[in-house]
C-alpha cells in the first residue's frame, strides 16, 4: 500500500493507494482511502518526525495491507528495522533521518477519552502529563456524542493541564466506523510528540483488556501478539507505551475516580450529554451496576429497570461469556440479587467474590515507562493499594471456561 502525506494550513492529510489484492478483507473493511488530522494552523510538517508519520499510518491501515507500506517520505533505518520484526516492510529508508530523541523530551502524552479509565490514568500520571483528545468530526446521523468529553477537557484546562483537542477523522477509514486498531486513538499524540516535547504515550487500557481477565482465561500480556507486534515499534520510534492502568480493573478505575480530584469529570457513556449518561447502553449498565455495588452511587430501582429494558443490554447479557464478565460478577456478588431477574442468581454465581479487582496488579509495573514508574506506583497505591502475592496468583489463575461451559445463556423474557 502506498501512503501519501501532505499538509496545508495545519491540516495533515493521509492518502492511501492500494495494490493488487488490497485492501484485504477482515471483520471490518477499509471504506475510505484518506483521512486528516487537524492541528493548529501554524503546525508545520517539519515539526513532525517522519517515523511518527509512518507509525500513525501503520495504526490507520494495519488490518488491510499486505505487509508493505511505501511512504511518500523517508523513515529512519531504526524504525524500518522495528517494522521488519512485525514482518512489515516500510520504505523508503532515508539515512539522513535521525531517530527521534525522546531522552531529551520532558512530558508524557495521554491519549485521553474523557471516560473513567482514561481519567483514572490521568489521576495517577504526573501533573505535567499532556492529555490529547481525538475529536471525531460529526458526520451524518450517529448516536455518538462528544459533549461530555469536550466538557471534561475544558475543565482540565481550567485546572492547569496542557490539554489539546485534535480533530481527526481516521475512524471513517473503517466500516463499521471505529478505530482500525486499539492504539489508533493515540495518533494525534504521536503526531504532536515532537512539537510538544513528548517522550512517551500513555493509554487508559485496563486489566480486563490487557490480561484478558473477564474473558475465558488469563493471558500474560508480554506473551501476546499485541505486545510482540506493537511494544517494540513504539519504543523504536522514540515513543514508548505506558499502561498506567494496565494492572487496574474497571473496578479499580471507578474507585480511583471516586477519590481523585478530577474523577467527577469522567463520563464513560459516549451517547449521553454532559453529566447525563444515556442510561440505555451496555457501558451505562456495566458502570451503573459497579458504582452501586461500590456505594459510589445509591441504588435506583427505576434506573436499573430501564437499563434492563434496553435491547443492547439484553443482547449483551445473553452472551457466553459476557463482555467484562468479571466486573459484573464482582458487582452482583455485592448486590441483592432478589431485586434482579431470577436468572441473575445462577448466571453471576461464582465461588470467588473477586476482591482482588479492587486493588492493583503490581506485575504490570513493567508496562509503565521507567521515567514515571515510581510516581505512578505511589499514586496507584495511595488510591487502591496493591494485591499481595496470593491475590496476584488468583488473578493469574483466572479461568472461566469450565464455568461458562455449564451455564445456559441468560434469558430476560
How should these model regions be labeled?
Residues 113:
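Conserved adenosyl
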Residues 30-65, 70-77:
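Extended, charged alpha/beta regions that create polyanion-binding interfaces
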Residues 1-49:
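Short Lys/Arg-enriched alpha/beta "domain-start" segment
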Residues 1-15, 56, 60, 64-68, ...:
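Nucleotide-activated chemistry modules centered on ATP-dependent adenylation/adenylyltransferase
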